[in-house]
Amino acid sequence: MTPALFRRALMVAGGLLLLPAPSHAHLMNTGLGPFYDGVSHFTLTPEDLLPALALALLAGQRGSRTGRLALFALSLAWLAGGLAGLTFPANRSATALTTVSFLALGGLVAADARLRPEWVTGLALVLGILHGYLNGAAMSQAKLGALGLVGIVTALFVAVTLVAALVVALRAPWARVAVRVTGSWIAAIGLLLLGWSFRAA
């Protein structure tokens, strides 16, 4: 192969590398099927992961009973909201509502709010229905169906269980302060996202 021919072949290969690949705007595509697409969607989407973790931190701060109530309420509400989103999908964005959940839950964790178990469970129900509906509508558009939703709820259940149990087990004062600092970071992320959503509007 002559140097000129080699350069041409290299230029063609480089040009082919610059061709755009298909992109997916909202849902992750692992190639492993809808269940794992749902799992990866939850773990890689901050709009879903961070409010769920903030709720787990809040529930863990209030003790094991509150943690258990919030865990099951959040998971079941997320599933119910997701099924509603699959059945009656809407194309509307709820960025402001999801970022308010960052702010509210992160602020409650940072303040170490002494909420009764019923209030934390109510917050879990509202969060689960809102985010579940949005996930269900996205699953409907991506044709992942109920199996993708089950993947999301499974990942949610595991994450909330682990985080709430970790916080319940913390006894050292510095560790409790670290939980509050984490809540303030989540609230700050929510504030940034809220500002960004108004800027884009």
Please give the residue ranges for each predicted region.
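Membrane metalloprotein/metal-transporter helix-bundle signature
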Residues: 2-201
